[in-house]
Amino acid sequence: KKKKVANISIDGITKIRIQGLEGWSDIQNVKPDIKRNEENGGVNLIIFDADTIHNEGGFDKRKQEIHDKISGTTCEIFLFPNNQDDGALEDLFENIINTKNAPIFDCWNKFETCLQDSASPKVGRDLTIPAKKSKIYVYLEALLGKSKEEKKKIKDPFRNFDDTDHWDLDTDYLNPLKDFITKHL
């Protein structure tokens, strides 16, 4: 499988290399790259979801598992959503929405409650609550226009996280991530 890599160069010199992985358990596959970067004087920053006990993770557990997989290297680790709680990138997104758009999530939460409390008994079995990725997708879908071009902006690679109509980039919730990145760049 082809590695996802992005390089950020300043004055023609690569300063930042971003290595995409399929998930935290893949990290041992790039351990040689981590060691090589370390030997060349680089700093290794690792950013993953902390996950929750519901998907065999959690902040403390995930951090330890990553340390175990990359033992013998020096890395700085940040786990979404805020480098202290269980959760994922989508939890961070949920906490940085523009507050004027909070009613969209209020509706979503009512939908989840309805599925659990009303629809499940009527269907005769427990229903699956859609993933948090779906919640973020629906949030953006509700805010963006109906044209094909606007709908494209809902998808991961085309999302505009600088759009202050959608996201509050000044919220204190982002401070742990901002501090982590600022400290190491």
Which ranges hold each PLM region?
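Hydrophobic, Leu/Ile/Phe/Ala-enriched alpha-helical segments that form helix-helix packing faces
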Residues: K2-K4, I34, I66-I70, I97, ...
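Activity-critical C-terminal alpha-helical subdomain
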Residues: D49-K148
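Generic secondary-structure boundary/loop-capping signal
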Residues: K15, L45, L89-E90, Y137, ...
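Charged phosphate-binding loop/patch that engages nucleotide di/tri-phosphates or the phosphate backbone
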Residues: L143-L185
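Small/polar/charged residue-enriched interaction surfaces, especially the RNA/DNA-contacting tracks
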Residues: N44-F48, I53, T164-D165, D179
